[in-house]
Regions:
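Hydrophobic core of alpha-helical transmembrane segments in multi-pass integral membrane proteins
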Residues: 2-11, 110, 210-219
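Membrane-interfacial helical/loop segments at transmembrane boundaries in membrane proteins
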Residues: 16-23, 120, 227-236
């Protein structure tokens, strides 16, 4: 229902779709970046808490830790305990984080839609914050589909494919394809589950393409934007 609500809101009011200006809800770029970073980690923390609660409700152990996705610092829930469950019981704990994100996005969109329709009149600062949350949630949900990283959608696809160690087997496969594999790496790949090896044969190309895309994004956008914000801060 939340997903349908989001789609209907965007269709009814295309202006609700986040623009680049939503990344600056406060008076200055530096303060806006700090606010976005804090907001991101707060929402991601709640996202991971949902994973943890769902895993505990399913009767398996789970833990939340700080990790990274490429050059991004993230929260991560260890859900390896789900492998002890039947496959059909693993999906809900894997998908509940995106469910939380969608519910938050739907609530924010309804508030913004109500404001545009004149049902309430938020202060400009609050309207900017709601637009920024929309941006964070759209980006957050979109990034879950980056299956070349260990995202929720990656975990769902790996589960649906019957894999248990796809990530490590993919890295071993890439080493072998590039000629960087040691005898130990080749032996580990041969000992891996046949299903993981079969899926890794095509997933490795998706992973490699994703890494190239991520490297381009870092060089073209992430690093220059970070340098500009730091330079602006130091020059004040």
């Amino acid at each position: 229902m939340a997903l349908i609500c989001c789609v209907l809101c965007f269709v009814a009011r295309p202006r609700l779709w986040p623009s680049s200006s939503a990344a600056f809800p406060l008076g200055t770029p530096a303060l806006s970046m700090i606010a976005l970073m804090l907001g991101t980690y707060a929402l991601r923390g709640l996202h991971e808490l949902c994973h943890w609660l769902a895993a505990r409700a399913a009767g398996v152990r789970a833990s939340i830790r700080v990790s990274h996705r490429l050059y991004l610092l993230v929260f991560e829930t260890d859900l390896t305990g789900l492998l002890a469950l039947p496959r059909r019981r693993r999906y809900w704990p894997l998908l509940i984080g995106m469910g939380f994100d969608t519910v938050v996005l739907a609530l924010v969109l309804v508030l913004r839609l109500g404001a545009q329709a004149g049902f309430w009149h938020p202060a400009p600062s609050l309207a900017n914050v709601l637009a920024a949350i929309t941006l964070l949630q759209v980006v957050g949900i979109g990034m879950q589909f980056f299956v070349f990283m260990r995202t929720d959608v990656y975990a769902v696809l790996a589960t649906a494919a019957g894999c248990t160690s796809l990530w490590s087997v993919t890295l071993l496969t890439l080493r072998c394809r590039l000629g960087f594999a040691s005898p130990g790496h080749r032996a580990a790949l041969q000992e891996a589950h046949p299903r993981d090896r079969a899926v890794a044969r095509w997933y490795v190309w998706l992973y490699a393409a994703g890494m190239l895309l991520a490297a381009w994004f870092f060089a073209a956008y992430f690093a220059p934007a970070t340098v500009r914000v730091v330079w602006w801060w130091l020059s004040r």
